[in-house]
Amino acid sequence: MRSPIDRSSGQPSPDSMSGTVTVAYSLQAIVARSGAFSSAPLPQGLHVVRLRGDIDMIPLHTAFRKAHDIPFCPFTDGDGTVLPPALLSLCQQWSAQFALAYIEAEFFGGSGCQAHALFSDGRAASPLVVSDHAINEALRYLGVAKGEARDEFEAIGLDQHRDTDRWTT
């Protein structure tokens, strides 16, 4: 984990007594505009979750990651600098038809960060970003506006679950 939480980034709220975050939050997913994945063949076990703001998300749950040798949050929990081969292949294949973003976040005990990898035209659209606001940046790339919400993260509802696997139940 790399940096303290910026409370405006749609992450867990601080404990009222200590001011620190006591709840863990982790997310690994691929996001795109609504309908983009409808023509994309999904690997077995993956499914599309409709979010607010015309965004669809494919949560990369634990069983899928283990089956395809994709580590837990390789950029925010590890020192990864490139996408694992199976994940890179999926992003390249799908992005030939539409823009998408791989997003990840990991926070615990008041610290953590986010990462994104943007794809379009079958290739990376920019360098990998690891920062406190990486997911919001990726969502803006996909055309999400925060509207009345605190930020883009909250606007599409990524604050509904605190763990990737919860999106699949």
Predicted regions and their residues:
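Charged interaction segments
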Residues: 10, 53-55, 60-169
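Short, extreme N-terminal segment that most often corresponds to the first beta-strand
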Residues: 2-52, 169
